[in-house]
């Protein structure tokens, strides 16, 4: 059987992969087999961390809201605020509440005092 050298198609495929990993260090940007492995690994990490980012931001928002709310009343916490928001049928998500908590604390205090009543 004769040997097939794979020609320009394989070269184009490898060049495309090399462009993806061009910023990697050492053999990870030079050798075809390790390029393939590192590309797969990078894509897996990117996919995992996109989900992780959503969790991390939600935790950050909750921490910010809780820190500001505890400064207002003696025995008031994040969980009570969220419970009272749902009870009052106010639709404010955690991202918006965190932005209000950072930029305008008095506004958040007013919201929390109104829903307590």
Swiss-Prot record:
Gene3D superfamilies membership: 6.10.160.10, Ribosomal protein L20
Annotated InterPro entries: Ribosomal_bL20, RIBOSOMAL_L20_CS, Ribosomal_protein_bL20_C
Main subcellular location of this protein, as a coarse class: plastid
Coiled coil regions in record: none
Keyword RNA-binding among record annotations: yes
Keywords assigned: Chloroplast, Plastid, Ribonucleoprotein, Ribosomal protein, RNA-binding, rRNA-binding
GO CC annotations on file: chloroplast; ribonucleoprotein complex; ribosome
Localisation per UniProt entry: Plastid, Chloroplast
PANTHER family on file: 39S RIBOSOMAL PROTEIN L20
Function statement: Binds directly to 23S ribosomal RNA and is necessary for the in vitro assembly process of the 50S ribosomal subunit. It is not involved in the protein synthesizing functions of that subunit.
The protein's name: Large ribosomal subunit protein bL20c
Organism: Citrus sinensis (Sweet orange)
Originating gene: rpl20
